[in-house]
Amino acid sequence: MSRIGYKTVNVPAGVEVKRDGDQVTVKGPKGELTRTFSSVISMKISDGAVDFDRPDNNNKTRALHGTQRANLNNMVEGVVSGFAKTLKLVGVGYRVQAKGKTLILSVGYSNPVEMAIPETLEVKVPDNTTINISGISKQEVGDFAAEVRAVRSPEPYKGKGIRYENEYVRIREGKTGK
């Protein structure tokens, strides 16, 4: 059983954590994040640390305990250093370009796929087969990266598609002829 909920979240200097009812706000050098937290789990904000405590040990409360602690830790980490993901396009003629707040993917379909880049994220295209996604919210960075990857996920026979930078795609053997 995981006991991650009992670990203290360290709050570095220059980061401010505030709770107003169910809303928790974390302000730091890179920006501000707000998230709704359950009032079932009590949160003690002290000098440079935040502790979580649960009233009972039922399954729902135990799950919330660890989740809320992990969410707050990710918020603190995000406003201090941010999060980033890198995607690679593998395949002949697969290209990407960024025009303003639009990402244009040419990945083997008859028309290019256009995706709107969320306002809170920064997307850079250093070359035409690499996409760098960065932002302060771990969830938003991961969700947008997964959305882009889902446009053409890697296929198992040649490995063509959009993949995360360090993702390993297991190549399967094709059918053998008679």
Curated annotation (Swiss-Prot):
Belongs to the universal ribosomal protein uL6 family. The keyword Zinc does not apply. The keyword Transport does not apply. GO terms for biological process: cytoplasmic translation. SUPFAM superfamilies: Ribosomal protein L6. Part of the 50S ribosomal subunit. It comes from Levilactobacillus brevis (strain ATCC 367 / BCRC 12310 / CIP 105137 / JCM 1170 / LMG 11437 / NCIMB 947 / NCTC 947) (Lactobacillus brevis). Transmembrane segments: none annotated. This protein binds to the 23S rRNA, and is important in its secondary structure. It is located near the subunit interface in the base of the L7/L12 stalk, and near the tRNA binding site of the peptidyltransferase center. HAMAP family: Ribosomal_uL6_B. GO terms for cellular component: cytosolic large ribosomal subunit. One of its GO terms (molecular function) is rRNA binding. Keywords: Ribonucleoprotein, Ribosomal protein, RNA-binding, rRNA-binding. It holds the Pfam family Ribosomal_L6. Gene3D superfamilies: Ribosomal protein L6, alpha-beta domain. Disulfide bonds: none annotated. This is Large ribosomal subunit protein uL6.
